[in-house]
């Protein structure tokens, strides 16, 4: 296989990885609390094995931390965050962070997320008395009627994306300055129109690399036939 094929293959691989990331963003443009993912690549210069050629290397992806829009729905247990920070839920004994505030009260009167995981307050799971009106202040203080029952754990720090809209800490977490908004949800921060344009561009880039590889392969075949005469 020629060096040009390797160059084209590295470019096609990077283009396809970028296409998959953008496609995932488009698919989750309506997912509550979803943060868009951005791919990044590195241009690798000549080395012992590169033989003077320049390659593109996929270096993974990072998420866009900017806020989505906050949409009011007047459901008392639905919460959104304005600013940097994350809610904390108990994921089988470990902390899972999220911006998805589609919370509800389960049969044990615990505040839980859409997956049934207990939402954490500063003192652990948040239990809400039956039949009381729930009110949540901007600082995360939770009231049942006139009684303060808990304070939401809202944290911030270095995190990595897990699944659709979950995050896990990669370092020490601290208290967040985000404002809690009750009766509202945060939308995805994906710009669907811009993402669709990016998706088309990524598809064309991948196709261009494929065509370049095919052209190089055809040239190699012709040269081999010529050399064999």
Model-derived features: positions:
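Amphipathic alpha-helical polymerization modules
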Residues: 1-229
């Amino acid at each position: 296989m020629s060096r040009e094929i390797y160059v084209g293959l590295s470019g096609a691989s990077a283009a396809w990885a970028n296409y998959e990331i953008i496609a995932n963003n488009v698919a989750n443009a309506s997912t509550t609390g979803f943060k868009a993912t951005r791919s990044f690549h590195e241009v690798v210069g000549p080395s012992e094995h590169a033989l003077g050629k320049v390659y593109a290397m996929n270096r993974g992806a990072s998420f866009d931390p900017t806020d989505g829009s906050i949409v009011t729905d007047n459901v008392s247990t639905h919460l959104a965050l304005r600013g940097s920070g994350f809610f904390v839920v108990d994921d089988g004994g470990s902390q899972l962070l999220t911006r998805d505030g589609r919370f509800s009260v389960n049969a044990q009167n615990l505040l839980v997320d859409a997956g049934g995981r207990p939402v954490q307050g500063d003192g652990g799971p948040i239990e809400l008395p039956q039949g009381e009106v729930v009110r949540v202040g901007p600082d995360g203080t939770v009231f049942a009627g006139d009684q303060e029952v808990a304070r939401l754990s809202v944290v911030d720090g270095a995190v990595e994306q897990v699944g659709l809209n979950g995050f896990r800490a990669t370092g020490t977490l601290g208290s967040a300055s985000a404002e809690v908004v009750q009766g509202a949800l945060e939308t995805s921060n994906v710009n669907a129109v811009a993402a669709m344009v990016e998706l088309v561009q990524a598809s064309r880039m991948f196709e261009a690399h494929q065509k370049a590889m095919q052209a190089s392969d055809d040239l190699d075949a012709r040269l081999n036939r010529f050399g064999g005469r």
